[in-house]
Amino acid sequence: MPEVPAAGLWPFLLLLAVQVSTVASSTQPWHCAPCSAEKLALCPPVPSSCPELSRPAGCGCCPMCALPLGAACGVATARYARGLSCRALPGEPRPLHALTRGQGACVPEPATPTASGLSSIEKEEAKASMVPERVPPESAEMTEEQLLESFHLMASSSEDQPILWNAISTYKSMRAREMADIKKWKQPCRRELYKVLERLAKAQQKAGEEIYKFYLPNCNKNGFYHSKQCETSLDGEAELCWCVYPWSGRRIPGSLEIRGDPNCHQYFNVQN
């Protein structure tokens, strides 16, 4: 899904909450923008003490030191070392919420003793069964976190999932089940989210279409806006974020648009 952690999944991705039904299509998924020689030249050196290099999280270009066993991890952190995966801590009541905030832990990948004798379909089913708090396809409670960051952390360290493609595929799957009738949705953020996905789905059909920056409304589970909104960047740059009113999505007057955390709670503390 092209998150976006600060440089790209940055947000991402979508992670682990939504299981998408495969949608047959001749179109190609959008991937991260290629890393130019200029961008690579700006990368800081990796410490010589680093035991294992890892691809950058999200759409970044600079190699990073892979996270070791037991290290804190999440959507916007470095990737974990080979043989590990990022999981919410045992007993965590909101696994997805914790992982999107870097509150997971690097643990050994669950063993699959009989994997060699399984078909590809059975392997995928076994993999999906390890996803905590999976949201069934019939669920209409899909936020930006679930759409954008699913399939990011739960993928093995060797996989590179096209995040935006998964978000659009999820949307198409819902439309196929006649579950995303925008006219019936009253919540403002949810309505805008599906309108944006509809536009992206249409743009994806155009041959040669390249989109490296876009905006997906960040909705809460009730269909209203999170006060912090960010663009999604697939070109390795830090995402721009800003603050909005949760009930309308309108920009808060005087709030800044910055690359990083705009600390939106400060505006509500002042007003209250």
Swiss-Prot record:
Coiled coil: none annotated. Residues 28-109 form the IGFBP N-terminal domain. One of its GO terms (molecular function) is insulin-like growth factor II binding. It comes from the Eukaryota. Pfam families: IGFBP (PF00219), Thyroglobulin_1 (PF00086). InterPro entries: Growth_fac_rcpt_cys_sf (IPR009030), IGFBP-like (IPR000867), IGFBP1 (IPR022322), IGFBP_1-6_chordata (IPR022321), Insulin_GF-bd_Cys-rich_CS (IPR017891), Thyroglobulin_1 (IPR000716), Thyroglobulin_1_sf (IPR036857). Residues 1-25 form the signal peptide. The modification Phosphoserine is found at residues 139, 157, 169, 255. The keyword RNA-binding does not apply. A motif (Cell attachment site) lies at residues 259-261. The keyword Disulfide bond applies. Transmembrane segments: none annotated. The modification Phosphothreonine is found at residue 170. It is found in: Secreted. GO terms for cellular component: extracellular space. The modification Phosphotyrosine is found at residue 171. Keywords: Disulfide bond, Growth factor binding, Phosphoprotein, Secreted, Signal. Binds equally well IGF1 and IGF2. Interacts with integrin ITGA5:ITGB1. Interacts with VHL; this interaction inhibits HIF1A degradation. Multifunctional protein that plays a critical role in regulating the availability of IGFs such as IGF1 and IGF2 to their receptors and thereby regulates IGF-mediated cellular processes including cell migration, proliferation, differentiation or apoptosis in a cell-type specific manner. Also plays a positive role in cell migration by interacting with integrin ITGA5:ITGB1 through its RGD motif. Mechanistically, binding to integrins leads to activation of focal adhesion kinase/PTK2 and stimulation of the mitogen-activated protein kinase (MAPK) pathway. This is Insulin-like growth factor-binding protein 1. It comes from Ictidomys tridecemlineatus. The gene is IGFBP1.
